[in-house]
């Protein structure tokens, strides 16, 4: 077959497939243009899930009449002029492809008027021909009317889902944009019915109300405010306490310089931060804003601009893990408060806090200090209140200023022991154990290089490894908490992490898992009856223990029952 050049119409329709996947893609691109044009109010009207009509009106800067034709051409943009401009890009759009791609697969009309202009102008794309702009009455700003999406590409149109499904995708797009542009007012109508109206939010309370309307009341009730800066990176936003988790990762919003992204590195880093407190199979919830020098992040990875590439991904990963871990650690049982900015130094390699028991360490006792004699102290001084009694040797009943607190004795003691063991390990170091039969491993060239580069890291992780020829190593000692039968796979997995990501957390996770198991077995088990003084000591330990609201497996350690809840149940005051 001969090579032939595609005509412009075919080439544009093929290229449009990268930008316009469904009606929601159109809404995203056009709203981003409105935001870049400094619009303070954006209205979106949808008919039949966007397949029939998408109409977006804004009060932004508008487009000069002489630029209207150029606006519908591919690779025409006002955002950048040369490749170097991408190093300092601050706008959401910059590729100059959106309008051209949309007009290639729809019937598009654009009307715009600039501030102080006597009239607006309208331009249409009919049968793939851009018409001459004509005068048209229009307020300041721009209106883009997109009708019959994919009318000329039947193969694409038949893959559209139901109008209800397509509309839900549109709604999610608007919610994502609304979460990063609080001062902009958003209105969404579907089939002439108002669905969303986010008013401009210029105060913290207004922004929190917008977040609550999107992520829900329960999220905000469990949310921790975070503001953390270090080494040129800043992370702001809200993370849910570890006790609030989801069965799906549907409440995870991460923005890089105001742009919503789906980035595996970022998602994995945030999940790693929750690793020590997350119940198996559950997902954390958060809305976070990462600010970074534009020169250190490449947003020109994919036409949809959902993906980014960091110049130093390890730097970003370590920062995110440390910031979120610090925030979660400062959340104490019974206390809800915003978290102050932290600038503490940290070691990104050792910050995973490997935590086995020291060699010869026995079970830690429940009460480390003699408690003060129990008195009727003012309740609010202690968030978990004061012990009243114990139920069947399992649950501790406590009273605080809100009402009744029920504590799972085993789960609470388990977390207390676990955190104390981790702290003790960090202070004293790892216990190592010699192998009866050293393990010989044959490595490929990449693995050999990774091991030679990270010998010191393996030593810190509790391994004694030596070279055994040009392509082999021999493992002689290992962390005492790890079983020898799994060491070969673990070391290979660690080397794979180092090759791919230049970092690893596998050993720390394995050690922490072993330590969590030890803490679980060492903790008080039901039925075990405590004195009031012992219950008091347990409550005070919980209040000062990191992640004291969750056991080592991510289950809650306590539950608050407010007086109002009890009054409602018993029909008091009715």
Swiss-Prot record:
The keyword Acyltransferase does not apply. Pfam families: DNA_mis_repair, HATPase_c_3, MutL_C. The keyword DNA repair applies. PROSITE patterns: DNA_MISMATCH_REPAIR_1. GO terms for cellular component: mismatch repair complex. GO terms for molecular function: ATP binding; ATP hydrolysis activity; ATP-dependent DNA damage sensor activity; mismatched DNA binding. GO terms for biological process: mismatch repair. Keywords: DNA damage, DNA repair. NCBIfam families: mutl. Belongs to the DNA mismatch repair MutL/HexB family. This protein is involved in the repair of mismatches in DNA. It is required for dam-dependent methyl-directed DNA mismatch repair. May act as a 'molecular matchmaker', a protein that promotes the formation of a stable complex between two or more DNA-binding proteins in an ATP-dependent manner without itself being part of a final effector complex. This is DNA mismatch repair protein MutL.
């Amino acid at each position: 077959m001969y090579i032939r050049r595609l005509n412009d119409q075919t080439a544009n329709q093929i290229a449009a497939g990268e930008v316009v996947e469904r009606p929601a893609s159109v809404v995203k691109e056009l709203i981003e243009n409105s935001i870049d044009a400094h619009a303070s109010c954006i209205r979106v009207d949808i008919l039949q899930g966007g397949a029939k009509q998408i109409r977006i009106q804004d009060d932004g800067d508008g487009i000069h009449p002489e630029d209207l034709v150029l606006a519908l051409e591919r690779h025409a943009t006002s955002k950048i002029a040369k490749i170097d401009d991408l190093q300092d890009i601050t706008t959401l759009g910059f590729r100059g492809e959106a309008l051209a791609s949309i007009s290639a697969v729809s019937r598009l009309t654009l009307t715009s008027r600039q501030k102080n202009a006597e009239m607006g102008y309208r331009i249409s794309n009919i049968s793939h021909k851009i018409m001459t702009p004509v005068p048209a009455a229009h307020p300041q700003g721009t209106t883009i009317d997109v009708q019959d999406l994919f009318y000329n590409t039947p193969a694409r149109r038949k893959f559209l889902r139901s109008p209800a499904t397509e509309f839900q995708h549109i709604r999610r797009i608007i919610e994502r944009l609304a979460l990063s542009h609080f001062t902009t007012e958003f209105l969404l109508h579907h089939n002439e019915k108002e669905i969303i109206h986010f008013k401009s939010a210029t105060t913290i309370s207004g922004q929190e109300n917008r977040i609550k309307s999107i992520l829900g009341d329960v999220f905000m009730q469990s949310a921790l405010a975070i503001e953390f800066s270090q080494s040129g990176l800043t992370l702001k936003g809200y993370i849910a306490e570890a006790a609030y988790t989801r069965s799906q990762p549907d409440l995870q919003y991460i923005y890089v310089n105001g742009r919503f992204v789906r980035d595996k590195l970022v998602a994995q880093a945030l999940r790693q931060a929750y690793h020590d407190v997350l119940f198996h199979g559950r997902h954390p919830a958060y809305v976070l804003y990462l600010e970074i020098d534009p020169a250190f992040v490449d947003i020109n990875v994919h036409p949809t601009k959902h993906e980014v590439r960091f110049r130093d991904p390890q730097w970003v990963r370590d920062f995110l893990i440390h910031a979120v871990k610090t925030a979660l650690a400062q959340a104490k049982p019974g206390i809800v408060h915003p978290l102050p900015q932290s600038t503490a130094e940290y070691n990104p390699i050792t910050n995973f806090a490997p935590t086995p028991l020291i060699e010869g360490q026995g079970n830690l006792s429940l009460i480390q200090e003699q408690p003060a004699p129990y008195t009727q102290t003012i309740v609010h001084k202690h968030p978990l209140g004061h012990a009243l009694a114990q139920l069947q040797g399992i649950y501790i009943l406590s009273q605080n200023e809100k009402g009744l607190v029920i504590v799972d004795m085993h789960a609470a003691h388990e977390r207390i022991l676990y955190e104390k063991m981790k702290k003790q390990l960090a202070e004293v170091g790892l216990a190592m154990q010699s192998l009866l039969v050293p393990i010989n491993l044959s490595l490929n060239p990449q693995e050999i290089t990774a091991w030679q580069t990270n010998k010191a890291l393996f030593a810190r992780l509790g391994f004694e490894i030596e070279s055994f020829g040009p392509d082999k190593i021999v493992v002689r000692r290992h962390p005492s908490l790890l079983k020898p039968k799994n060491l070969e796979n673990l070391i290979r997995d660690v080397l794979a992490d180092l090759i791919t990501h230049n970092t690893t957390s596998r050993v720390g996770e394995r050690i922490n898992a072993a330590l969590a198991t030890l803490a679980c077995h060492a903790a008080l088990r039901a039925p075990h009856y405590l004195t009031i003084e012992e219950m008091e000591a347990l409550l005070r330990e919980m209040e000062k223990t990191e992640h004291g609201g969750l056991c080592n497996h991510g289950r809650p350690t306590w539950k608050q029952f407010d007086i109002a809840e009890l009054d409602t149940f018993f029909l008091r005051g009715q």
